[in-house]
Design a protein with these regions (language model features):
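A short aromatic-anchored loop/beta-hairpin motif
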Residues: 2-103
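Solvent-exposed alpha-helices and their adjacent loops that cap or buttress functional pockets
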Residues: 2-3, 35-36, 121-125, 152
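Beta-strand elements within well-structured catalytic alpha/beta cores of enzymes
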Residues: 7-11, 41-46, 132, 153-166, ...
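Short, basic/glycine-rich phosphate-binding loops at helix/coil junctions
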Residues: 9-10, 67-72, 122-130, 207-208
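Short glycine-enriched loops at secondary-structure junctions
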Residues: 47-51, 62, 109-118, 166
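Flexible, glycine/proline-enriched loop segments at strand-loop-helix junctions
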Residues: 75-83, 105, 133-140, 216
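Internal, conserved structured core segments that host functional sites
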Residues: 89-144, 149
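Surface-exposed, charge/polar-rich loops and edge strands
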Residues: 94, 98, 127-128, 136-141, ...
């Protein structure tokens, strides 16, 4: 057991271009890497590994996945060679039981939702990492409960990093001109922040029932970028501080909100 409890982070990752850029959000990720206790290992949950069933990367050297198209060549030339941890993958299999977890040794790696933020936090890529997939067949409350199980790792020197965007509607993105947030995007983003510290039965949690908000479905036409937040909220002990390292809405409907537990 580690003497220092590791924080749990939800990071709004946004565009892959953040890898190449220096902006408010990337600087906040850099600051987290410089100021938080250094983890022995990282478990990352990314919106970009959305599967039927649960998988975890279990290879020694996971590949860098460039899961995007139409970006500058410099982005495809960027790699994040962080080591994997088959031992940590096996630990997750036991910790998450009876949920069946598949050990992935060849199909996935670190996608841009994970390495795109961690390359700013830990640019030396020298911390062992595994990536856990998001089961597309499960309801929101189930993902919150997965976070509760993962919380135990925080006392073992392992940091939980979840990566997504709480408002993620690419169909309404303002690619050019006025990039001011849509009112519904602002409303939902504020709703998320207002309910981060809510306590009560999981099934009644406002952020588990996020689609009940009038802007919930428009902010998240699909759930994969929202669900990573629930893993982090599930890992909260109900007493630790919850802070917001950075916030903002880009291109009208892309929230860059980040949340820190502990």
């Amino acid at each position: 057991m580690s003497s220092t409890r590791m924080p749990a982070l939800f990071l709004g990752h946004g565009s892959p271009m953040n890898v190449l850029e220096d902006n408010l959000y990337t600087r906040s990720w850099q600051k987290l890497g410089m100021t938080l206790p250094r983890p022995q290992a990282i478990v990352v949950v990314s919106a970009h590994w959305f599967t039927r069933g649960t998988g975890v990367t279990a290879m020694e050297t996971p590949p860098t996945i460039h899961d995007f198209g139409g970006f500058p060549q410099a982005l495809y030339d960027t790699h994040y060679p962080a080591p994997g941890s088959p031992a940590l993958a096996q630990r997750l299999v036991k910790l998450l039981a009876p949920v069946p977890v598949t050990l992935d040794k060849e199909d996935w790696g670190f996608d841009h939702g994970s390495w795109g933020v961690l390359i700013k936090m830990y640019p030396d890529a020298d911390i062992p990492m595994v990536q856990l997939s998001i089961d597309s067949s499960k309801p929101a409350a189930w993902h919150f409960e997965m976070g509760r199980k993962l919380a135990a790792l925080r006392d073992e020197g392992i940091m939980l990093v979840a990566s997504g965007n709480v408002v993620h509607n690419l169909r309404t993105v303002k690619w050019h001109g006025d990039s001011s947030p849509y009112p519904w995007a602002m409303s939902f983003n504020e709703y998320v922040k207002a309910n981060l510290t809510w306590q009560g039965p999981v099934e009644q949690h406002p952020l588990v029932n996020y689609l009940d908000h009038e802007g919930g479905a428009l902010s998240n036409p699909t759930p994969e970028h929202y669900l990573p937040l629930l893993y982090v909220l599930g890992a909260w002990d109900g007493q630790e501080p919850i802070t917001i390292p950075v916030d903002g809405i880009e291109m009208g409907s892309l929230s860059m909100l980040s949340v820190q537990i502990g």
